[in-house]
């Protein structure tokens, strides 16, 4: 008998429901999706709405409202619950409030007997991923955050628009905090087989343009929040990408929130931060400790140190 893959989603807000929708229409290998939320009517409504579209799907998926007991035999628990950014707030402003929420959620999930993989999308995601690891006492490779996957997708979109190519032909990453201290790996960026440094040397793009592009990545969430109140479609797709990489054992490289403990120059230890990593059925197979330029390494140090300063203030 074939194994039935089961995912539990904790949080039926904009991000959670966008992920649930993306997963449902993706024809993935997930067979069962359980949705949990304190706002039970909201969660039940999302379940009903998704189920009413089953006729239009290539493959039906069992979707139900549930509780933490349903986590006991789940392969993956996705957490999107928590307070969202308000206009004018940074992601780091949410640390104290969401840490309290996560303590209750994570301990409830673990109490069910869950032994699968956590995927965290709540902000500030790098810190909430660390909080999940601490409260669950899970191995670090079994706790994953969405990290800078969304930031990287935004960057590749902007680069693709600028160079008039498909996003699949852009090879570049945003690393560091999913937030204001992130940085672009310009020195390693390629458009298909051609390095960005070659375009700069030829005068086909300028450093000023690239700086503006990174500012647009950093400010994207603030702009979307100002216009529509929250971001959820793109991150919903990002979570789905991570979940499918785990379920399908893809060995896919994504800039997720990974546990760093001495990589990239041994300058900061014991944090989660956005770094390209191999995602497989066991979670994080490997954090890719590849060489980045000195100027980018300095930005990574600054970003990591900022996250570490917040983590050190949390009492576990």
Curated annotation (Swiss-Prot):
It is an enzyme of class 1 (oxidoreductase). NAD(+) binds at residues 15, 37, 42, 68, 82-83, 121-123, 146. One of its GO terms (cellular component) is cytoplasm. Pathway: Fermentation; pyruvate fermentation to lactate; (S)-lactate from pyruvate: step 1/1. The keyword Ion transport does not apply. It is found in: Cytoplasm. It catalyses: (S)-lactate + NAD(+) = pyruvate + NADH + H(+). Its EC number is 1.1.1.27. Allosterically activated by fructose 1,6-bisphosphate (FBP). The modification Phosphotyrosine is found at residue 222. Keywords: Allosteric enzyme, Cytoplasm, NAD, Oxidoreductase, Phosphoprotein. Beta-D-fructose 1,6-bisphosphate binds at residues 156, 171. PANTHER family: L-2-HYDROXYCARBOXYLATE DEHYDROGENASE (NAD(P)(+)), L-LACTATE DEHYDROGENASE. Catalyzes the conversion of lactate to pyruvate. Belongs to the LDH/MDH superfamily. LDH family. This is L-lactate dehydrogenase. It comes from Borrelia turicatae (strain 91E135).
């Amino acid at each position: 008998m074939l194994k039935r893959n089961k995912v539990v989603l904790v949080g039926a807000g904009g991000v959670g429901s966008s992920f649930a929708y993306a997963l449902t229409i993706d024809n993935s290998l997930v067979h069962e999706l359980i949705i949990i939320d304190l706002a039970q009517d909201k969660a039940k409504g999302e379940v009903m709405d998704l189920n009413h579209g089953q006729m239009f799907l290539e493959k039906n998926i069992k979707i139900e409202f549930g509780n933490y007991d349903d986590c006991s035999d789940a392969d993956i628990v996705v957490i999107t619950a928590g307070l969202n950014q308000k206009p004018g707030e940074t992601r780091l402003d949410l640390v104290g409030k969401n840490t309290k929420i996560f303590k209750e959620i994570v301990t409830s999930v673990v109490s069910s007997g869950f032994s699968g993989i956590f995927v965290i999308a709540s902000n500030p995601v790098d810190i909430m991923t660390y909080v999940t690891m601490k409260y669950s006492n899970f191995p670090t490779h079994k706790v994953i955050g969405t990290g800078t996957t969304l930031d990287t997708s935004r960057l590749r979109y902007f680069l693709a628009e600028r160079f008039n190519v498909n996003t699949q032909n852009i090879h570049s990453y945003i690393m560091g905090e999913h937030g204001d201290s992130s940085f672009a790996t310009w020195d390693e960026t390629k458009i298909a087989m051609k390095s960005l440094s070659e375009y700069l040397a030829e005068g086909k793009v300028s450093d000023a343009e690239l700086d503006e592009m990174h500012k647009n990545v950093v400010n994207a969430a603030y702009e979307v929040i100002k216009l529509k109140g929250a971001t959820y479609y793109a991150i919903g797709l990002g979570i789905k990408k991570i979940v499918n990489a785990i379920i399908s054992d893809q060995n896919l490289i994504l800039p997720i929130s990974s546990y760093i403990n001495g990589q990239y120059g041994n300058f900061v230890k014991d944090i989660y931060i956005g770094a390209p990593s191999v995602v497989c059925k066991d979670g994080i197979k490997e954090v890719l400790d590849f060489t980045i330029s000195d100027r980018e390494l300095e930005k990574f140090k600054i970003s990591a140190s900022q996250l570490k300063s917040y983590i050190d203030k949390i009492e576990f």
